Each structure stands twice: as structure tokens, then as C-alpha cells.
């Protein structure tokens, strides 16, 4: 049983799978997070072919991934949704969460959580927040951005400054330990995932665990697990 999430690992994983199957009776199964990566490279397709054609069966977590997988392999595939997490603890009182994070409990908070990469659309969210502010619809609310930057953060800092959002965006640009995750989701009124591309997202499952409504974009598998108007809202990524 193997796990696959990026073509970068395909040369190694594909070789291991072929060696394992070389005895003629061992079957290789794969729990697959992504087929096509969020940031594309010329080697993605040949690397994917090398690994995925050496696998006897798959478990996928969204129909988006299943559709991409079918372009490479006709091996049996089983759907199993992304599970909820158990390692982040239980929801705490909002007042306690605000104290822990140094937040004003009188303010409403939107939360953008997790690794900050181009495809996650933080730039879209900042532009949208600026529009809300100009329209007078962001009064009494702030945006928490919590996570490590995997792309140069200077462009986002410029965007915040250019839009006059210095007092509207609370930036916790660091790794968030498991023990602190519950405070962010307990303090938030809703979670925002303005992704430009996606398959499925662990952030969505954390929001479910802590019973926090979501606003997500209609990309990849996000809309599959966030019914519009029931547990949140689905919008276009523009």
C-alpha cells in the first residue's frame, strides 16, 4: 500500500512498485491525493505515467482526482472521502480561543488557514476583502491569515498595503502546531478557501471537525464536499 501526492516522487515510487510486483503475485495499491500537481512542470505527465501504470488499484478522495486518474490508468479505483482529523483536539469556547491568540472577541473573524501557495488564491481573497471594505461591508470584521508562506510573501504584503488593509489582516505567517489549530478554528466565524485549483483539501475537513461554515471556490473537489447553502457557500474563483 503506497500513498501518492506529487509526480516528483514518481521515479522512486514507480521503481519500488515494479520491484514489488516482480514476484508475480504481489499487488500494489495506492491511496492517491493528487494526480496533476497544483503547480505544473514538463515532467508531470511522463512521471505520472511511470508510476500510475505500475499500480494495481487506487483509493481516491474526490471525483476530480478520479477523472484525472482515468487518463493514466484503468485499474480498479475506490472512492473514500477525506477523513476528519482526530489530532487537533476539541473545539473550545470562542472567548478562550481569542485570549489564546490575542484577538479582540468583539470582532468577527474570517480564517484563511494552511500553507500559502499561489494556487490557494490569497491574492483573490485580499482583493475581495478590499472591495468589501470599500463598500462598507467589512466593518467589525478582520481576516486571519495563518500558515507558512511557500511563495514570496512580499507580494502579499504589498497587496495589503496598496489596498489599505494593514488594520484588517492579521498575519500569523508561521507553522501552526497541532495544539494551536483548535484555537484558530474556534475563534473563526467562517473559513475561506479561495483556491484557483484544487482536488480536495484537509482544511475543509478541519472546518467540519470544528463545525465552522466555509466559503469555497467551485474548483476541483471542493464543491463536492461543501454543499452550497447548507454548510457554506460555493462561489466562482474570480
Segments predicted by a language model, with ranges:
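Glycosyltransferase donor-sugar binding loop
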Residues: 142-155, 174
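Conserved acidic donor-binding segment of nucleotide-sugar-dependent glycosyltransferases
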Residues: 228-229, 233-238
